[in-house]
C-alpha cells in the first residue's frame, strides 16, 4: 500500500511541481527579455539625449566663433551666456547614466540654450526623427 500511496502523491503533487517549474522557466525567460528590452530602451533614450546635447554644443561653438570678434555690450552679454552654456555642456556627465541629477542638469542646459536663442532672436526647432536630428530656424 505504501508504493501505491507514492504513486498517488506523485500524481497529486504533479500540478504543484509543474506550476513551480513553469514559474521558474517563465521568470528566467522574462528576465532575459526584460534585460534586452531595457538595453534597447536605454540605448535609444541615451542616443536622443546625446544627439540633443551634441546639437547644442555644435550650435554654441558656431556662435562662439561668430561672436568672437564682436565687442559691443550686447554681444558681451551674449558671450557670457554662451560661455555658461558651453561650460554646462562640458560638465554634463555623458558616461554616468546613474548620475542622480542628470535630468535636472539637462533641463538647465535646455533653459540656458533657450536663453541664448532669445538673446540672438532666433526660434530654434530641435527635432529627432528617423532621418536624423537637428535644429532648424
From Swiss-Prot:
Main location: nucleus
Superkingdom of source: Eukaryota
Record's subcellular location: Nucleus
Keywords: Acetylation, Nucleus, Phosphoprotein
Tissue distribution: Widely expressed. Highly expressed in placenta, kidney and skeletal muscle.
Residues recorded as bearing Phosphoserine in the entry: 4
Stretch list, region deca-GX3 motif: 22-58
GO biological process assignments: protein maturation; ribosomal large subunit biogenesis; telomere maintenance; translational initiation
Subunit relationships: Forms a complex with YAE1. Interacts with PYCR1 and PYCR2.
Note: Amplified and overexpressed in oral cancer cells.
Protein role: The complex LTO1:YAE1 functions as a target specific adapter that probably recruits apo-ABCE1 to the cytosolic iron-sulfur protein assembly (CIA) complex machinery. May be required for biogenesis of the large ribosomal subunit and initiation of translation. May play a role in the regulation of proline metabolism and ROS production.
Family statement: Belongs to the LTO1 family.
UniProt protein name: Protein LTO1 homolog
Amino acid at each position: 500500500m505504501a508504493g501505491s500511496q507514492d504513486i498517488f502523491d506523485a500524481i497529486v503533487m504533479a500540478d504543484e511541481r509543474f506550476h513551480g517549474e513553469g514559474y521558474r522557466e517563465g521568470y528566467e525567460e522574462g528576465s532575459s527579455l526584460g534585460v534586452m528590452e531595457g538595453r534597447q530602451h536605454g540605448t535609444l533614450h541615451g542616443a536622443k539625449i546625446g544627439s540633443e546635447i551634441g546639437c547644442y554644443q555644435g550650435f554654441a561653438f558656431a556662435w562662439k566663433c561668430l561672436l568672437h570678434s564682436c565687442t559691443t555690450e550686447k554681444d558681451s552679454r551674449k558671450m557670457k551666456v554662451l560661455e555658461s552654456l558651453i561650460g554646462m555642456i562640458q560638465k554634463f556627465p555623458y558616461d554616468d547614466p546613474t548620475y542622480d541629477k542628470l535630468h535636472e542638469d539637462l533641463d538647465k542646459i535646455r533653459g540656458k540654450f533657450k536663453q541664448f536663442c532669445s538673446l540672438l532672436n532666433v526660434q530654434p526647432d530641435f527635432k529627432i526623427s528617423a532621418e536624423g536630428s537637428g535644429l532648424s530656424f
